[in-house]
Every structure is written in C-alpha cells, then in structure tokens.
Amino acid sequence: MNDVITQLLRGTHEVLRLEELQKRIESGKPLRIKAGFDPTAPDLHLGHTVLLNKLKQFQDLGHETIFLIGDFTGMIGDPTGKNVTRRPLTRDEVIENAKTYEEQIYKVLCPERTLVMFNSSWMNAMTSADLIQLAAKHTVARMLERDDFAKRYAGGQPISIHEFLYPLIQGYDSVALKADVELGGADQKFNLLVGRHLQEIYGQTPQVVMTMPILEGLDGIQKMSKSLGNYIGIADPPDDMFGKIMSISDDLMWRYYDLLSFAPLAEVARWRRECSEGANPRDVKVRLGQEIVERFHGASAARKALENFEARHRDNAVPDDLVEQVIAVPDGGYPIANLVHDLALTASTSEALRLIKQGGIKIDGERLEDPKCRMTAGGTHIIQVGKRKFAKIRLTP
C-alpha cells in the first residue's frame, strides 16, 4: 500500500471499496470528492471537522473537493439514528443556518480550491414525475434494512414517506455531481451506499464510500451535537475552546487525538505509553488544546488561552487530589442551586442561591451570575464555593 493511501486511511472507519480507491488514486486523474452537510444549526463543531479534515487531505493531493450544503434535504430532516420523525426545517431556517457555513469551513479548507454547492440547485428543478421515477429505483424492503427504520417498524413507531425519500435524494446528489468518492459519518453508510446504487442505475461508475468515526461530545458518550450541549464549536472563542478541551476525560482525550489531531502517530503512541507509565496526562491534554486552538485562531491566541487557563486555576488554587464525581443530568438540565446543594457544598438550595447572588460560586474559574442557570450534560467541571470548597464533576445524560 503506497504512502498516499496510508495517509488517506488514517482515522477512517470503513472504505467501500479500497481496491477501487487505490486504482483511482494510482490513475493520476483528479477525483471529485464530495461531503454533504445539512444546515441543521448555524455553527459547525469539531465533530464536523472529522469530515472536513479528510476533505482537506484530498484537496492537498490535488483532487476536486465539493462541500455540499444540503439545503433541500435539510427541509426533509435526516432520519438517521432517530426513533421518531425529525422535525423538518423551514426554508428560512435552512438559509439562515447556511449563511455561516462558508466562513467557517475556510478555517479548514482552501477557499480557492473548494467548490461549495447546494443540492436545491438540481432538486428544485426536479418535477413530480422525476421524483416518482427516482422513488421507483429503490424498494421499501431495502429501506427497512436500515437499522433505525427496522427498529421503528418493528416497534410500531410511525415512519413518514418523506423519510424514505431522504436517502434517495442524498444518493441522487452523487449522481448529479458525478462523485468519485463520498465522505460521510459511519452512521451515514446506508445513505452513501444508496448513492453507489443509484450511480450504477444511471450508468455512472459507482463512487467509493469512505466513512469516518463519529466523534463523541464532551460527555464522552453521545455524538457531539449542539442540541445536546456537548460540543466544541469551531467559532468558539479561544479561551472557551481551550477550556472545553481541558475538561474532557483522559480516555476521551486519546479519542480526540485519533480523530482531530495532526500530530505524528508515533508521537501520540509515545505520549500514551508515557502516561500509562505514570506521566501526567494533563500535559498531553494541553498539547491537544494548543493544537486545536492554534488551528482555528492562530498561535498567539493559543498561547494566550493557555496563559489565561493557568492563571484562573492558579488563582483559584484548585486541589490536585479532587475525586471526579459522575452526575446524571435530568431532562431539562440540572438547576445549579440544587446541584451545589446535592454536592454538599452548601447547607441548602437557598444558601446556594444567596451565594450566587453574592458572587460566591464559580464554575471552571468563572463567577456564576445567573441563579436560574441549569447545567447540561457534557464535559468535566470544577465548581468552587467560597475560597475552600471544591467539587470536580462529570455530567452525563
């Protein structure tokens, strides 16, 4: 296997089919590489960059890279992994969310070598007859091979007809673009294979499918998602970005190195070995935080974020021997006053509320000002009450 293929396989989950990818790379012909993103929220996060980084690798090798904004599919709602019908977005919501994407993706991709497209360009031109012909190219039985659809069907949960259209339209995007390679999350494998199937039907060479692992959020359990509050946005301020990375568990840190870092694999393996032999993983986490912040904000901002982080922790004199407590967060969030009381940091919730109003409670070194604040799942936090009471907590769903 040549060095280019080895580089492209780093961090991938699955390639269908590897021998096809090798032949196309070895042909020397520039390939059309497609990655699609539905504008379900206005901000991209580090989970999205797992795909963007792979797209950038192809871009650096001279291939044509297409960042496809699924403005049409966004109005259907991706049913992947859902046990209920997802609320479709309105046209206004889709347009508003998509506005920020181009600015954000250029923190990773080269603007001059990136083709940004919208799938409404061809889907809006499709007639009712065209759509029916497209629907005729797949069967209900094949759709029910999808794990999420199968579970909902077996459990008597409703599946709307428009949800069956989603994988067909995503697959048709590959036909419209004549994609050679499509990148997607591991949970998108079914949809990407529909693209291969449709390309064959339309007389095209089927695309190679490359799936990437799903990045866990700050809680280390669920997929990184803005709706779950467990995300690190690529537009987050440097201090916030660095602080969030420093809040993740040591185990999750290695996962982030695997999927987000550009550090040489040999170095990461050495750091992992040293930590297993007693080295402090905090130092390795600092390296990760510095690398990520520098990528999106520059070296100066990364240094400043580290200085600010260390100053906050030095001034707060957080004990080194704090034992991490795992706290389950109820639906709707954990009211901070209740949480502080439940951690035995105050004698009552009313005392906690009084201390918040007096500025006597800090979270991760920042003074808490909102007594109605609710903590959501995701990450590890230090809660400080007064000068001497501390708790280290990891919030899970």
From Swiss-Prot:
Pfam families, A to Z: tRNA-synt_1b
Short motif 'KMSKS' region, span: 223-227
SUPFAM superfamilies: Alpha-L RNA-binding motif (SSF55174), Nucleotidylyl transferase (SSF52374)
Domain of life (superkingdom): Bacteria
A GO BP entry: tyrosyl-tRNA aminoacylation
Protein source organism: Methylococcus capsulatus (strain ATCC 33009 / NCIMB 11132 / Bath)
Enzyme Commission number(s) of this protein: 6.1.1.1
Motif 'HIGH' region: where in chain: 39-48
Keyword match Aminoacyl-tRNA synthetase: yes
Cysteine disulfide partners in this protein: none
Protein name: Tyrosine--tRNA ligase
Function: Catalyzes the attachment of tyrosine to tRNA(Tyr) in a two-step reaction: tyrosine is first activated by ATP to form Tyr-AMP and then transferred to the acceptor end of tRNA(Tyr).
Subunit comment: Homodimer.
S4 RNA-binding domain mapped to chain residues: 334-395
CDD domains in the cross-refs: S4 (cd00165), TyrRS_core (cd00805)
Record key words, sorted: Aminoacyl-tRNA synthetase, ATP-binding, Cytoplasm, Ligase, Nucleotide-binding, Protein biosynthesis, RNA-binding
Gene transcribed to yield this protein: tyrS
Annotated catalysed reactions: tRNA(Tyr) + L-tyrosine + ATP = L-tyrosyl-tRNA(Tyr) + AMP + diphosphate + H(+)
Residues annotated as signal peptide: none
UniProt-annotated location(s): Cytoplasm
Record flagged with keyword Nucleotide-binding: yes
Uppermost EC category: ligase
InterPro entries in alphabetical order: aa-tRNA-synth_I_CS, aa-tRNA-synth_Ic, Rossmann-like_a/b/a_fold, S4_RNA-bd_sf, Tyr-tRNA-ligase, Tyr-tRNA-ligase_bac-type, Tyr-tRNA-ligase_bac_2
Classification lineage: Bacteria, Pseudomonadati, Pseudomonadota, Gammaproteobacteria, Methylococcales
